A protein has these predicted regions:
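N-terminal regions immediately upstream of nucleotidyltransferase
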Residues: 1-34, 38, 61, 81, ...
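Sequence-level detector for tyrosine residue identity
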Residues: 40, 73, 106, 133, ...
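Intrinsically disordered, low-complexity regulatory regions of eukaryotic proteins
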Residues: 95-100, 104-109, 143-150, 155-159
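Extended low-polarity, hydrophobic cluster-rich segments
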Residues: 44-46, 67-73, 110-112, 149-151, ...
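Conserved catalytic core of two-metal-ion nucleotidyltransferases
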Residues: 85-138
Length: 172
């Protein structure tokens, strides 16, 4: 394993901090883009920790180089969410250390925030929505995300729920 990874345990308190950062970045995005705020501000289905960091939350041994966080929205009939949106944020000082690839730019670990809209309605069960999306493998994002793990960080009552891998669903 690379020394660039942190092997510190991710707690629910850590997930809450990451969720707060994601929420703040989301509001900043909508503030800069009122056209997207009109369509999507009230259509958030869930937010998930993904890829290696999520797998580390599940198994405790993968390690973390970056926290990948995805926000998923119920697709609006007028336009899909601009999924190319990609924002980097700073976790700040923490037990996870600093971003090894660019330590001068970050006080702590890097958080990469992405978002996309999915074929569902506001209020749909986020677990079912994500499992259906990942099982379908219809997009490159779905195929990439299902290779590791997804752990919900919003809505808060699902904080820490492991959506993927799911023992109840076939993995491919």
């Amino acid at each position: 394993m690379s020394e660039e990874r942190s092997f510190e345990r991710i707690t629910k308190s850590d997930l809450k901090k990451i969720a707060r950062i994601a929420r703040s970045e989301r509001e900043e995005f909508f503030g800069r883009h009122p056209e997207w705020a009109m369509l999507y501000r009230k259509r958030l289905v869930c937010v998930a920790l993904c890829k290696d960091a999520a797998l580390h939350f599940v198994n405790g041994s993968t390690g973390i180089d970056v926290f990948d966080v995805w926000s998923f929205y119920a697709e609006h009939a007028e336009a899909p969410f601009p999924f190319q949106q990609f924002v980097k944020a700073d976790l700040g000082k923490s037990k996870f250390g600093r971003d090894a690839s660019n330590p001068e730019a970050y006080e702590g670990r890097r958080i990469e925030l992405r978002a996309r809209s999915l074929d569902c309605k506001p209020g749909d069960d986020p677990i079912e929505v994500l499992q259906r999306y990942l099982r379908s493998g219809e997009t490159p994002s779905a195929r990439e995300l299902r290779e590791k793990a997804l752990v919900l960080i919003e809505p808060e009552h699902f904080l820490g729920y492991v959506v993927w891998p799911s023992l109840a669903m076939p993995n491919g």
